[in-house]
């Protein structure tokens, strides 16, 4: 099974783009060359701000969704403190208990 990664790319105007991939370097190069997400085209210099292994595709999709819901401040904290991402990932792996 190929591991999936979550990554954040910082644009020239300091915005953070969130995505998932099985190969961070390849995907980053695609974004750099304008062949990646339309949201990053024409945004100037891009830098890889954060990447971390997530596990399988299903978990990566859930992590991506959760990170995209975060505020800019929360995303900056995630970039600065790896423990924040570890907590987020752990919360996705813990099964939710539904009460009747």
Curated annotation (Swiss-Prot):
Q: Which CDD domains match?
A: GIY-YIG_UPF0213
Domain GIY-YIG, by residue range, is 2-77
**InterPro entries from the entry?**
GIY-YIG_endonuc (IPR000305), GIY-YIG_endonuc_sf (IPR035901), UPF0213_domain (IPR050190), UPF0213_GIY-YIG_endonuc (IPR022992)
Q: Which family does it belong to?
A: Belongs to the UPF0213 family.
In Swiss-Prot or TrEMBL terms, this protein is called UPF0213 protein YhbQ
- Originating species: Escherichia coli O127:H6 (strain E2348/69 / EPEC)
Gene coding for it: yhbQ
């Amino acid at each position: 099974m190929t591991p999936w990664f979550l990554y954040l790319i910082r644009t020239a105007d300091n915005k953070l783009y969130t995505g998932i991939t099985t190969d961070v370097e390849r995907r980053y190069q695609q974004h750099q060359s304008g062949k990646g997400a339309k949201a990053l085209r024409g945004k100037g210099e891009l830098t890889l701000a954060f990447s971390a292994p997530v596990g399988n595709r299903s978990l990566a999709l859930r992590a991506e969704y959760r990170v995209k819901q975060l505020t800019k401040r929360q995303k900056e904290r995630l970039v600065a403190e790896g423990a924040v991402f570890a907590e987020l990932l752990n919360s996705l792996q813990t099964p939710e208990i539904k009460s009747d």
